Amino acid sequence: MLAAGQGSRYGMPKVLADRGAWLESAVAALWGGGCSRVIVVLGAADTAVPDGAEAVYAPDWREGVGASLRAGLAAASGDPDADYAAVHLVDLPDVHADAVARVIAAAAATESGLARAFYGADPGHPVVMARGHWAAVSRTATGDLGALPYLREHAGLVRRVDCDDLATGADRDTR
């Protein structure tokens, strides 16, 4: 779960928003959606993470979400039992476990192991990717684009998972 940003448009690091309720909600969505391990990538703010989740620090968090994604995938890569990564963001408070579970199931059912939530016509999170994609995603994850360059380059492999019946998928950039 990517939560390293400064939240400059929001006015504070979003990992601290609503006294940590967004963090709790995002971690609960991942646990409830079927993740066996939850890694929270921190940067601008150092805070406790919910019980059972693991905190990882992205030292280059100022570079953008790409740095956070690289840190999270590096941490996941150390687990030989991790076959998939479900990438979720802290600033999506209305995305819950049902959306995570739906995208995980879709990724597991595809040969490519790539699936992404869509809310109407808009791509969103979570994004689920099989381990075989992690190194290439990390190489292309720069700035605030995160996995987008890789997902665009491999668009034909990404399963679109409609989740607009479950959430808006809208990120919260302002208060």
Give the role of each language-model region:
Residues 92, 126-128, 170:
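A residue-level structural signature of the nucleotidyltransferase/glycosyltransferase Rossmann-like core
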Residues 139-175:
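Conserved alpha/beta core of the MobA/IspD/sugar-nucleotide pyrophosphorylase nucleotidyltransferase superfamily
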Residues 91, 134-141:
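Short, glycine/charged-rich beta-strand-loop motifs at protein surfaces that mediate ligand recognition
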Residues 17-19, 128-130, 172-173:
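Short beta-strand-to-turn element immediately C-terminal to the catalytic PLP-Schiff-base lysine
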Residues 2-123, 155-163:
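Nucleotide and nucleotide-moiety/phosphate-recognizing core
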Residues 124-136:
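Conserved nucleotide-sugar donor-binding
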